[in-house]
């Protein structure tokens, strides 16, 4: 029944879109579509600013609404109708997520669609790579809804990431472009900025961290499962280091009761990476951001076998970054204590995860859009 409803919806949208295209003239505008948030992301805002400078005749419009998986209400339907109307009269569309109207509708030839995704890296698998897996889409729904069809180009963070995105979106490799992300431009531009005020705020909030090296752990959320960090928390050397754990905002399963650990909810992920002396990642894009800031990065993957079966992995840190990746908490702690992450290790993480981020990604994406 669900599949039948989806088919009816798809063909109904196509019928309506035919008339929208017929009566909507193409204008010099770029439309930004997203299901990641109700507000334009920083990537979107930076691109809109660049469009205003590079192509001042182009106007920017945002159509953003947080879309939950397997959920659609009246607000979602209303937003899709607005997105359809916008697409019917646009010259350029930038998206950072899978958006139904982009993939299932037949667009005017004047419209160029660029997918920048919401993460410059894809350490874990997604899209067509994870069909019928616990955290993936069903193959029936993916085919009916033509998941990730309709893009002219997909922008990623590095050349190494290209084949993974090509597989996840079922696109030719030549359409996957390692131009980097706009937000990386800003991170690189602020790399040498003074952060004394931010540090003062942190030490005022967490006075017991003063005088200690700050180790920031940024675990990926496991849907319906707690982060496996009990051994790390128990064995961690708190006299020398402050362990700050920044859980995913949607993580409701991980509980940590050790009073020595800082479970931060005050500062942003980027602020914590900026303040970190050491960053611990697992399967998220946090490692890329840390590498852009030349931070020592380690990968902690105690549940890698289970996680790979549940979510799928494009990048196995134990294989790709063996010198700085650990499945055992004791080995990770020893490596941090020995400052084992070298400049070469950080450079390798940066090359593989965000090698296309050279500080000029925003302008390159806009140039691509205007070609």
Set out the residue ranges of the language-model regions.
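Membrane-proximal basic amphipathic "stem/tether" segments
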Residues: 1-37
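Nucleotide-activated donor-binding/catalytic signature segment of Leloir-type glycosyltransferases, i.e.
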Residues: 251-267
């Amino acid at each position: 029944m669900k599949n039948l409803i989806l088919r009816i919806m798809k063909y109904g949208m196509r019928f309506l879109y035919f008339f929208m295209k017929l009566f909507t003239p193409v204008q010099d505008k770029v439309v930004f579509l997203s299901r990641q948030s109700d507000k334009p992301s920083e990537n979107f805002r930076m691109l809109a600013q660049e469009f205003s400078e590079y192509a001042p005749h182009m106007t920017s419009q945002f159509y953003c609404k947080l879309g939950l998986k397997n959920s659609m209400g009246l607000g979602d339907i209303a937003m899709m109708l607005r997105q359809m109307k916008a697409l019917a009269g646009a010259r350029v569309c930038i998206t950072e997520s899978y958006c139904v109207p982009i993939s299932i509708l037949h667009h005017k030839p004047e419209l160029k669609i660029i997918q920048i995704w919401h993460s410059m890296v894809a350490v874990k698998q997604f899209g067509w790579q994870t069909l019928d897996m616990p955290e993936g889409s069903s193959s029936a729904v993916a085919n009916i809804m033509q998941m990730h069809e309709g893009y002219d180009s997909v922008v990623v963070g590095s050349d190494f990431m290209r084949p993974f995105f090509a597989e996840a979106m079922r696109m030719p490799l030549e359409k996957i472009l390692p131009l980097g992300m706009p937000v990386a431009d800003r991170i690189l531009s602020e790399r040498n900025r003074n952060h004394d005020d931010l540090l003062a705020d942190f030490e005022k909030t967490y006075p017991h961290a003063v005088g200690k090296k700050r180790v920031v752990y940024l675990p990926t959320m496991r849907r319906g499962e707690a982060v496996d960090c009990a051994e790390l928390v128990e064995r961690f050397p708190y006299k020398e280091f402050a362990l700050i754990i920044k859980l995913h905002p949607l993580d409701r399963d991980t509980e940590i009761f050790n009073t020595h650990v800082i479970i931060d909810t005050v500062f942003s992920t980027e602020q914590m990476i900026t303040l970190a002396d050491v960053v611990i990642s697992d399967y998220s894009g946090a490692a890329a951001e840390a590498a852009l800031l030349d931070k020592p990065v380690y990968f902690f993957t105690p549940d890698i076998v289970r996680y790979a079966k549940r979510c799928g992995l494009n990048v196995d840190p134990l294989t790709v970054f063996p010198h700085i990746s650990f499945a055992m908490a004791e080995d990770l702690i020893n490596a941090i204590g020995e400052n084992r992450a070298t400049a070469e290790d950080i450079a390798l993480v940066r090359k593989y995860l965000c090698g296309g981020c050279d500080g000029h990604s925003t302008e390159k994406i806009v140039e691509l859009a205007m070609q």
